[in-house]
Amino acid sequence: MCRADWSTSLSRSAAIILALLIAGCGFQMQGALRTPPEMARTFIDVDDRNSLFARELHAQLQRADVDIVDTATAATARLSITYEETDQRVLSVSARNVPTEYEVYYTIQYAIDAGERRILESQTLTVTRNYTYDSTLVLGKAREEELLRDAIVEDLVRIVLKQIATL
């Protein structure tokens, strides 16, 4: 009986110490996205509403209970995506001058206005991922590039949402 109490006490002490260490280093559980009240009704101003980034941003803002409106006049805030580019570039080539490694990148530039007031100055974000290329696995590598691009977009949206949460 005494042995069980000692084991339980040791487990509780270890759990408390671990919780204090985690809290002490600044770790916080990620909660729901907090958006400023000005973004209650947001218009997303983007050239291509069907781009990967625009679709993912739209979906994530809706999940955060932001009402995405179709016109700027109905909005309390305007999230302007002024630049969006995605592509890939060769990172390395073989001795036969055949690409062996690529970098996939996605760059966006955006700002947020609430009425006449800019609440987030223009920001430029670029996220990149590398992958090796094997000409014998063309179909698999095309799918890998697609998955990397999807992951990059998710990362970009996550960064934008974190910046919005700090407003």
Where are these regions (language model features)?
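Sec/Tat-exported extracytoplasmic proteins
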Residues: 61-65, 112-116, 135, 159-167
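Solvent-exposed, acidic/flexible segments
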Residues: 50, 54, 101-105, 145-154
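C-terminal motif of bacterial Sec signal peptides marking the signal peptidase cleavage site
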Residues: 21-24
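Bacterial signal peptide processing site
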Residues: 26-29
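Bacterial N-terminal signal peptides that target proteins for export
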Residues: 1-14
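N-terminal segment of the mature soluble domain
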Residues: 37-85
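C-terminal/domain-edge helix-coil "capping" segments
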Residues: 139-167
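Surface-exposed short loop/turn segments
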Residues: 74, 80-124, 130-143
